[in-house]
Amino acid sequence: MLDKIVIANRGEIALRILRACKELGIKTVAVHSSADRDLKHVLLADETVCIGPAPSVKSYLNIPAIISAAEITGAVAIHPGYGFLSENANFAEQVERSGFIFIGPKAETIRLMGDKVSAIAAMKKAGVPCVPGSDGPLGDDMDKNRAIAKRIGYPVIIKASGGGGGRGMRVVRGDAELAQSISMTRAEAKAAFSNDMVYMEKYLENPRHVEIQVLADGQGNSIYLAERDCSMQRRHQKVVEEAPAPGITPELRRYIGERCAKACVDIGYRGAGTFEFLFENGEFYFIEMNTRIQVEHPVTEMITGVDLIKEQLRIAAGQPLSIKQEEVHVRGHAVECRINAEDPNTFLPSPGKITRFHAPGGFGVRWESHIYAGYTVPPYYDSMIGKLICYGENRDVAIARMKNALQELIIDGIKTNVDLQIRIMNDENFQHGGTNIHYLEKKLGLQEK
């Protein structure tokens, strides 16, 4: 097993990684910015290293500082968590070149899956169903581009090859808008991602967001751990996640899961990963692969009993998967609500000091967070301050538990989205299951009905 690792992240995921390390007897090094000295995992880690001032670019995105911290503490590996440098192929490469283990896939795999055009090509080759599209980057010949759009059928969506998180994409509903949309998306992509390559896909009007969790050891073994539904979104950011996805039959799960597991072997994948799909009219359409642990990984852990962070650590230590596909069983249902420090009306971040805090509890209730009474939420980072996960023997029980847990949760001193989450849990359409990715924005009046 690994002797000592650097946790190159902050907040709830850093604490989650630290807990897994402690259970496995792995020593921990918490690297942190000057604003994060009082973070829970920093207070609990075996060693701490301040890697720079508050802004992310000078601390959590500072590659030389993170690698130096590993060197001076004698760590053997670096866990990137999610966000920050977790899907940065150059970081993964520099970590390995410096003689450390990157807890995640190889740099070339991150690069392959990070570029949407090469990722789609690799998935098609592996037999994973993809959205009908241009099968490569768009050129300057508008006659050819119009022909592609006609073949796919309007509406289409123009996407930046290096994009993500809802940025660098435009919906086009007819020939008249096509040329301008391509040039505008190119300009946007160049500015945001330093890559003006764009491609075209069929635009699905009312899809759900369903994703498959995978684990692969890089030694020819891979498994899928059922699916999650993350359709409750606002501005392409997930708000509520659940597992398994409502209405997905065991046959459908096996069909898509086996293809994802095979794709992992085909591309030489190592670690935890997630295949994201749009799901409409009983069909899956691959959109991207996240080559890291996801925010919503706990709902999968709750229904399968598999500790995904521990598996990441074991795989990084060179061990084969500790679980076989036939040992993965889906039991019950889990729902996760992301708790954000934000104004519930404007959705603007709400940093500040937490004056009073009480975590919910009870059977089947899990609270993943770094906050405590007296903790000051800094203004420099993502607004998510916790995740509330509730498990039940079925979906109705999980939702009922979540309603109670949200009512129990007390966070005073800052504004949060707890009331929004209570509204979602009480929403009839959510309770019925299977709402699409536009549902929440329409409910909130952020999108035309």
UniProtKB/Swiss-Prot annotation:
The keyword Manganese applies. Mn(2+) 1 binds at E276, E288. The active site is at R292. It holds the Pfam family Biotin_carb_C. Residues 1-445 form the Biotin carboxylation domain. One of its GO terms (biological process) is malonyl-CoA biosynthetic process. The keyword Lipid metabolism applies. Binds 2 magnesium or manganese ions per subunit. It comes from the Bacteria. GO terms for molecular function: acetyl-CoA carboxylase activity; ATP binding; biotin carboxylase activity; metal ion binding. Hydrogencarbonate binds at K238, R292, V295, R338. Pathway: Lipid metabolism; malonyl-CoA biosynthesis; malonyl-CoA from acetyl-CoA: step 1/1. Mn(2+) 2 binds at E288, N290. Mg(2+) 2 binds at E288, N290. Residues 120-317 form the ATP-grasp domain. Keywords: ATP-binding, Biotin, Fatty acid biosynthesis, Fatty acid metabolism, Ligase, Lipid biosynthesis, Lipid metabolism, Magnesium, Manganese, Metal-binding, Nucleotide-binding. Biotin binds at R338. It catalyses: N(6)-biotinyl-L-lysyl-[protein] + hydrogencarbonate + ATP = N(6)-carboxybiotinyl-L-lysyl-[protein] + ADP + phosphate + H(+). Gene3D superfamilies: ATP-grasp fold, A domain, ATP-grasp fold, B domain. Its cofactor is Mg(2+); Mn(2+). Its EC number is 6.3.4.14. NCBIfam families: accC, PRK08591.1. This protein is a component of the acetyl coenzyme A carboxylase complex; first, biotin carboxylase catalyzes the carboxylation of the carrier protein and then the transcarboxylase transfers the carboxyl group to form malonyl-CoA. This is Biotin carboxylase. It comes from Escherichia coli O157:H7. The gene is accC.
